Amino acid sequence: MPKLRSATSTEGRNMAGARALWRATGVKDNDFGKPIIAIANSFTQFVPGHVHLKDMGSLVASAIEEAGGIAKEFNTIAVDDGIAMGHGGMLYSLPSRELIADSVEYMVNAHCADALVCISNCDKITPGMLMAALRLNIPVVFVSGGPMEAGKTKLSDKLIKLDLVDAMVAGADSNVSDEDSAKIERSACPTCGSCSGMFTANSMNCLTEALGLSLPGNGSMLATHADRRELFLEAGRRVMALAKRYYHQDDESALPRNIANFKAFENAMTLDIAMGGSSNTVLHLLAAAQEADVDFTMADIDRMSRLVPHLCKVAPSTPKYHMEDVHRAGGVMGILGELDRAGLLHTDVFHVAADNDGTPGSGTLKSVLAQYDVMQTQDEKVKHFFMAGPAGIPTTKAFSQDCRWPSLDNDRQEGCIRSREFAFSQEGGLAVLSGNVAENGCIVKTAGVDESNLTFVGSARVYESQDDAVAGILGGEVVAGDVVVIRYEGPKGGPGMQEMLYPTSYLKSRGLGKACALITDGRFSGGTSGLSIGHVSPEAAAGGTIALIENGDRIEIDIPKRSIKLAVSDVELNARREKMHSLGPMAWKPIGRQRYVSLALKAYAMLATSADKGAVRDRSKLED
């Protein structure tokens, strides 16, 4: 029977000092011997997805203590990618993922916690905590802050839904009046919560449901809705149940590595492809798989992208649907239910929402779907749960409203979530491309690509940084038919693998959204749409071919064939590579780029791998 990890610091005379310190935190004599449950919160006043999390730890703690545990909360950092966008702050976003993972590991291991609840929400926080949870492999439950309500405003006597990207595009479009731009800006982000579309934050919070590590509704229930309160309380109860199963019953199915196994990662990626999730999720799933010692790679993603249909189309891929609409249609469980009926899901994997009593099928995703898939459940409480909707009242307070949709969206032919027969497309919303530009692959969010752009041939317009590309786009250098190439923005070359939301938004604002393509060894915001190809691997700084592209080179993109090709002969490419090598210390570095890189970022860059490895640390450099 496993011994409580916390016994290391609470048992024996030699731990008298540690017990004295535990007492100073409020632990009583009769508490010693109870499991200590760490609560990793990410409250901050910098991020709308996190401004309402201050009291969430107390909610979780109350449920833990009622169930017989000791709850101890700590905080991690949280970077807002939208606020950090378009300037040097974005260099810190992806590296913060590793910092968050390390900080959770440090706190949990330093204090010998027995189990963990992760209160996350936005872009790098959920992935960072996920990496830590799989690294630690102690009982864990994830509960996020939830998505914000979609913005709404009236323009030309028409009510339209909005999000952050609409504000950015309007602000850069000279054809939009100052008055209309201001209306959009003030209406785009009306409440607390993660941005309202299927951007990175919401994509990752949905994927934790598919991985089996969070409760149904975690990815889709609005931050403002009163029903979300129960998710925090249930997270506390569930983590205690998992801890008891592991420490009292020696049930290893309660551990995250036995829940988030290879099949669960396939489920998560299947969901991601079906819902057209952010391309960043590929980066984060690959990183999490490495922490879990799961052999899940770009090759698996490529294979699955050819099999999984696109069942759910959400902003930024369409202005019609946001996360509040996904929830009304049954949330993640609704999408998983359709995937199951299409024969594309592993339902025999364990899930934290299911009790494992030892009987066949218990504790698995199959039993969770039977209860929470709105197309098969007979539970009226579940149907009521998924009818939770927006109030349309600007607020930064959680649980501030209890509005309901008049009905569920069960229309699987023309609704927000479709059955396989009526899919938005029979190929999913993400694809892996490869070719001489990206020998180890690159990613495109096909959900956001217009059908007319599935194949594209154009001339390279090369920039050594995102800043130069933005200046070139706004300055009129980029014209229809160009393939904008932004390089030296990968994990090592940036460093930090910046998001390219401004270049793609500015292309749209200049009417070039469908007339140009963009490829980069950087990445894209979850809010990006259009022919935007990122994660080119190897990156320029690691000797990738993207560093050898010259202005005017012909680039051929064929998404149906999963191909991206630089139409330059091997002889010429080899000559360019030799010329690059001849530069010595200046080889594989951006020409003329002026950028301050701090010591912290330089330390990150020294160990960073390319995107096809999840941009995690190169373990070979850390081995004894």
Swiss-Prot record:
Gene: ilvD
Chain sites annotated for binding [2Fe-2S] cluster: C122, C195
Gene Ontology terms: cellular component: cytosol
Enzyme Commission code: 4.2.1.9
PANTHER family: D-XYLONATE DEHYDRATASE (PTHR43661), D-XYLONATE DEHYDRATASE YAGF-RELATED (PTHR43661:SF3)
Cofactor field: [2Fe-2S] cluster; Mg(2+)
Organism ancestry: Bacteria, Pseudomonadati, Pseudomonadota, Gammaproteobacteria, Alteromonadales
Matches recorded under Pfam families: ILV_EDD_C, ILVD_EDD_N
A single BP term in Gene Ontology: L-valine biosynthetic process
Name of the protein: Dihydroxy-acid dehydratase
